[in-house]
Amino acid sequence: MKIIWYGHSCFEITGSDGTVIFDPYQEGSIPGLNKLHLKGNLVLCSHEHDDHNARDCVDVLPKEFKVEKIETYHDHHLGSRRGKNTIHILTYENMKVVHMGDIGCMIDDLSKIKNCDVLMIPIGGYYTIDTKEALEYINQIQPRIVIPMHYRSGDVGYDVLSTNEEFIKNRKDICYVKDVIEVNQETQKQTVIFEKPRN
């Protein structure tokens, strides 16, 4: 499968099973990113904020996928400040792909996502968990491939978010790619840093 990054928390998973879009953003909702025009078979949105719920930006030809959900919170206060958040667990080409959405809290039961193949996790803080908390999750989950998201990079992203610099300093298995990476059962354990969003 190929994983394409469109910036922020938006990814396209595409391959023999079809195309799934995670957390597409509304036009103008994120500094430095353009309007999305995507095609897919399923759109998964972690919550209903404009930078994660642009279903109308995706032309959908419906297809069924195996998707599990874990309901969490967007903050450390049981959702009282920013609401709820959904972790999506997609089974794709016999691999487990986990998108953490805008998770803003630590959860105890990680059994459904332990040792997943791909983990997409926010690191920018303020609206979500920060780098320290993300690293704690990674240590507990032990994913094969880690993809950080929801951080500031150059002119792209919210000013209040941290960059990925601290996160990179704490990872030893960095693999830099442009905006897409191909993943299969043989892909080695690594942390993927996308250099520039496709959008």
Summary of predicted features, one role per range:
Residues M1-L42, H49-V118, Y126-E133, Y176-N199:
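Core dinuclear metal-dependent hydrolase active-site scaffold
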Residues G40, V118, A134-Y151:
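Proline-aspartate-enriched helix->loop->beta-strand connector
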Residues R82-G83, D130-N139, V160-N164:
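Charged helix-capping and loop-helix junction motifs
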Residues H47, I123, M149-Y151:
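Short secondary-structure boundary segments
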Residues R144-I145, M149-N199:
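Accessory terminal helices/loops
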